Each structure stands twice: as C-alpha cells, then as structure tokens.
Amino acid sequence: MNILFLHRNFPAQFRYIAQELAKDPNNEVVFITNNDKINLPNITKVQYKLKRQIPKDCHRYLRFVEESLIHAQAVAETAITLKNQGFKPDIIYGHTWGQTMFMKDIFPDVPLLCYFEWFYNAKGGDIGFDGKEASIDDLAKLRTKNSHLLIDLYSCDAGICPTKFQAKQLPKEFQHKIKVLHDGVDTDFCTPKEDVKFVIEDKKLTLTKADEVVTYATRGMEEYRGFPQFMEAISILQKKRPNMQVVIAGEDRVCYGPQLVGTTYKKLMLEKLDLDLSRIHFVGSLIFNKYVDLLRISSAHVYATYPFVCSWSLLDAMSCACPIVASKTEPVTEFMTDNKTGLLFDFFNINQEVEKIEYALDNKEEMNEYGNNARQVILKSYQLKELLPQQINYIKSLIK
C-alpha cells in the first residue's frame, strides 16, 4: 500500500499510525509536512516551504483562510512533484488545516481521508461559552473561517474525528462521511508508578508522591484552558496550604482563543495576584517521559477547557491513574464522570475549583480510587494498541 500523509507538523496526530504502517515492507509511507526537525525510520518525509506570508492588508475575515490557502498551494506543488516522479498513493490521509484542499485535483481517483479537528459554530461550542454574545461581525468572521473545512467535507471520501463532541460540531449534511475514532493512548507508557521523582533542577527541588503537589499542563497558558481561573484558585489555596507546591508545564503563549493586547495571561495573573512564587514552578514544555513523571507524582492534576478540542494530556493523565480535578465541560464529560473518575467543577466558579482541589489534597485514598477508575476507562476504550488496528483496517477499507 502506498499512503500519503499530510500535516503541517510532523508526525503530530499521525505518529503512531504512520510508524505502524512503515513497519510493513510492502507499504510505502510518504509524509508531506512543513516540519524540518524530525525524521522517522522507513517514512519518506517531504518538506514543503511556504512561498509567502499572509499580506498585511488581507481582509481580517480571511486571514485564517489565507493561511490555509498558502499551505494548500505549497502542499499541492509538492504533491505534483511526487506525482511527476512516479509516486501515486493508494490513499491520502491528511489533517484539514489547508493541506488536503487540492488533493482531489491532483489525484482525483485516489480516496481522500480527512482528519477533522474543529468546526466553528455560533452555538454549542466555544463561541459564547463565556456568556458574551457574538456580534454579527464575529459571526461573519466565524462563518468565513470554516471555508477550507467545507471544501474538505465536500471533497473527502471519508473523515475521522477523534471524539464524539468534536464530530458533533460538523454540519449534519456531512455526518454520514464521519467516523469517530480516537487516536489512542499509549497505556503501556502512561502507567501509574510509585517510586518516581520529579526534579526541578534550576531550583534544586525534588518532588515525589509524598509531597503535596498540584499540577497543571498545557501547550499555552490561555483562557480556553482555564489558566486565569487556575491561577486565581492557586492564590487562594496558597494561603490555606503552606506545604503545597504547584508545577505548571507549558509555554507563555496562546494556542487557542483570544490573545491579550500588550501582555500575556501569565504576566497578567502574576501582576494581578498575591502569589508565593517560591512554591510555583513554571517548568516550560516537557519532553514526554518527564511530563508523565510529573503526572505520576501529582496529588491533584487540574485540567480545564472551554467546549473545544479536548487535550491529549487529559487522557494521558487518566491512563496514569492521576488524581484529576477537571472542568465540567462536554469535552471532559465524554471521558470523565464526577465522583467516579475524578472531581469536576464549573469552569467559571473559582471557589468551586478551590474546593475540589482542596478535597483532592485531603482525600488521597479516595482520589487514588478515582484515578484507578479513570485508567480503567482508558484501558477499556482508548488503548492505542486496540485502536491502531481499527485505524489501519478503516484506511484499508477505503481503498478501492
């Protein structure tokens, strides 16, 4: 089988499936990407380069679409070069961030499988969750933002969504094309472990399960992942719990949602709140094995999200049997049950978040039980080694 993967990043969501397919000598795995940093065995990585950037005078409704088009054109040119060199895929599997837009024009008779991550809606998702009514201007921008996704929904032979909540966001006219199939969690790696140390070298601090540690992990410290509310909660908890250590993994940036003008959410909260920074440790982005060790020593791992894409990190934490305190939002409740696999709080209720974290810290035995229950959920339905064969069989079923 010849399979062509498309993603701006490499290997991103396709890491496990691309590597698994590449193990078979009968398969040729080609991956078109914008990433130049990583290579994987038996995968032919073909890097594309962008010819231009978004023009400054671009209509603001079109900036996201323009960015997608710039990537789409670069991927298309790269695919044409591969075609001229004699490569023809049996199937194309791509992320719908622009890369897949023109594939049917280059390989019209090749099945196109699209990975759909998020379709923007005026209701039922992230928009309006904060109680602010979207203006007509906002809605017009939102409608335009889906343009490239609508092209892919029309063009693709089939689509994959990793969760039911994400699939529900897609238009009903295209639901017949969509299969809900999660990426899978490496449950052999993300396991609970007792004798673990998490070392913060620049502070000469070693943390273990014997310590009282509240953890928070995110790609970006942003509103969509509840970072401001988390910091508010920590400012209250610090005054009540002198031995509590807080470890925050992630970068001082916004990946999703609105950015602040002239500052960041981290800077804003550090300026606004009375915090004991000697007990708050910003450790940046962690390599995966160190991140898993952080989960293993956590006394209470806090995860919050708008009704939006659920972070992989939540399921990693569940697989590690981590004591979890999370927001009671639909991306979370698809996987977690309050008082069974963790403790859930209202996203905007800081006092409730404080209460739930404090309860977790005071009731370790109960939280250990919830953590074990959470791991069982992952073992039952989201194991990578169970889902990977399903993904491969689904891909093969689409080849004519």
Question: Where in the sequence are the language-model features?
Answer:
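Acidic donor-binding loop of glycosyltransferase active sites
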Residues: D157, R296-V309, C322
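Nucleotide-activated donor-binding/catalytic signature segment of Leloir-type glycosyltransferases, i.e.
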Residues: G250-V254, L260-L286
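Conserved acidic donor-binding segment of nucleotide-sugar-dependent glycosyltransferases
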Residues: D338-N339, L343-I350, Y359-K364
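Conserved donor-binding/catalytic core segment of Leloir-type glycosyltransferases
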Residues: E201-R225, M231-Q238, V246-V247
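Carbohydrate-associated surface elements
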Residues: F165, G184
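N-terminal subdomain of nucleotide-sugar transferases
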Residues: M1-V46
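A short, well-ordered alpha-helix in the C-terminal region of glycosyltransferases
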Residues: Q352, Y359, E366-S381, L387-N393
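Acceptor-binding helix/loop patch of EC 2.4 sugar-transfer enzymes
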Residues: R52-L62, V110-H148, D188, P192-K197, ...
